[in-house]
Amino acid sequence: VALAAGRGLPVWAECGGLMFLSRSIQWKDSRYPMAGCLPVDVALAERPAGHGYEEVLVDRPNPFVKMGSRLRGHEFHYSQVRDAGQTETAFEVKRGTGLGNGRDGMVINRVLASYLHLHSLASPDLASGLVGAALRYRREENAARRAGPLPE
């Protein structure tokens, strides 16, 4: 997964997907390696860290959704992302918790990961954004295959 994401594969991850893409998950005194696509670690808690409706404003560039769009859904997570302040984010949280400090939606290359469980009917721009990102990636991959290997 990390190799494909590093090559530019578009990845949209919600909650558990965000956790999977992190470097590691910590539960009590144990740490477990994860995919390593995101330069963050996740710590699990015994109580919810975010619970309820979440609404975000897309206020920074990202691979999937136009700036100015509003996305709505819910969050329910017992985890907190460590070092989230050191990554680029695309969402200003208007309602809810997200990653904390009023932000959600980490962006690394073409990976966007957030705690937001999106309600697709309340976020109509997302489907076309996901399909558009996938089509761009396919065109780039096809062009790279036609060009052949780089000379050494």
Describe the function of each predicted region:
Residues 1-63:
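Cysteine-nucleophile active-site neighborhood
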Residues 44-152:
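Amide-donor transfer/coupling interface in amidating biosynthetic enzymes
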